[in-house]
Structure formats: C-alpha cells, structure tokens
Amino acid sequence: DPFNPVIKDGRIIGRGVNDMKSGLLCALYAMHLIRKSNIKLNGNIICAALCDEEGAMIGVKDFVQTSFAKNLTSAIVCEPEENRICIEQKGVAWVKIKLIGSMSHGAMPYSGINSSFPMGMILTELEKLNDKYKEFSSKYLGTPSVTPTIVQSPSIEGGVPQNNVMPGDSELVLDIRLTPEIDYANFKKSLDAIISNINAKYKIKIDIELIETRPPVKVDEN
C-alpha cells in the first residue's frame, strides 16, 4: 500500500517520500545544521515548501509576490532527479488551438465548414517543427518538442461525435517543451505562419489561447 509508509532497513518507503518529502527534509536539516554550527551568513536562507508543482504552480507564483522573495538572489530546488545535480531545466508552454467551422450532415458536407481537414494540416506542419528544432538541442536537455496532447473533433462544446455528422469546431492542445536555446516567441512565430497558410486555404476562423508558459532556465556550469 503506497499510501501507508513503512520504515525498512533505515529507509522510509511510501508515496511521495523521494519526490519530494526527502528534498524538503534535507533542506530543513541543512538549515538546522547551519544554525547549530553558528556559521555567520551574509544573508538569509528561506525554506519554501510550495504546492502544485505538477499543475499551475500556484504555490511558487504566490510566493514570488511576497516580501519573503523580494531580495532572493538564488535558489536550490531539491527535486531528486535520480541524484544528479541539474543546471538546466526545460521551459514549457501549453497552447489551445480552436478551429471554428460549422456542422452539417454527412450527406451535405458542402453546406458546412469541416474543421477536421485544417486540423490535420496543423498537426502535419507541427510535426515538421520537431525536426527543425533539432538545431536548438541542449547539451543536457536534448531537443525541444511540440506534442499534441488533446485532439478533439468535434470539440467538447461541439457535442457528441456521430458517424453521419460533420464536425464544426475542433480543438487541439499542445505541450511545447523549450530549451534555453529557444523561447516561446520563436515557437509562436512558427505557429502564426502555419495558421496564416491554413487560413489562406480553408478560410476558417482559428483562435489561439496561451494557457500557461514558463521560460527555460540555465545556470552557468561554474
């Protein structure tokens, strides 16, 4: 039972022990030892136990707005990472793309605007970006990537899919992982070019929503 932690051979085994209660414990214990040894520091150390790391990161977003974070100059993140010291982290952007056509019966497809074909074209062009992004590979992080995680036609609001009904609206969510060599603005420029070409061919309304973005981070090796 992962939700019932046990101690075995001097180790705690259970859900969340490694990621990331052990990191939090190490940080607290290090602060305890520094205080106990009476080492004089040229500043303050703050231990921040923050929530929602897997989601919208509301914990750290709130923390950086507080007076505690005002004068911070650096941070150590105690993520386990297979016991390796990490000096780079990929950035991420989640983007929702909605194609707005008009639904029609399968027997009369030309009376509506089918969003599935332009959606397929978007996916094809985005796949080509992954090859292009190899030139932005990082020594430690590998290659940036564009990954469709949700593809829906019709969209959630568009109703239940049916064999004989042509979808009007379609929806796509992308998970974009960025290295320090490329930023979101670079990706957005490529996406805008793709959308422009599709609009010229299909004359369909396309909305782009940036759900969340976090920049890549790089620390000098020295």
Predicted regions and their residues:
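Acidic/His- and Gly-rich active-site-bordering loop/insert found
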Residues: 1-15, 36-41
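Short secondary-structure boundary/capping segments
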Residues: 3-5, 37-39, 66, 86-88, ...
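Conserved hydrophobic/aromatic pocket- or pore-lining residues that grip, position, or stack substrates
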Residues: 5, 47, 174
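Conserved Rossmann-like nucleotide-binding pocket used by diverse enzymes
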Residues: 13, 76, 147
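Short, conserved micro-motifs enriched in small and acidic residues
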Residues: 13-25, 40, 110-116
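Short beta->alpha junction loops/turns
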Residues: 17, 52-53, 112, 180
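Acidic/histidine-rich catalytic neighborhood of metal-dependent amide-processing enzymes
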Residues: 20-90, 94
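Metal-dependent amide/peptide-bond hydrolase catalytic core
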Residues: 80, 87, 94-222
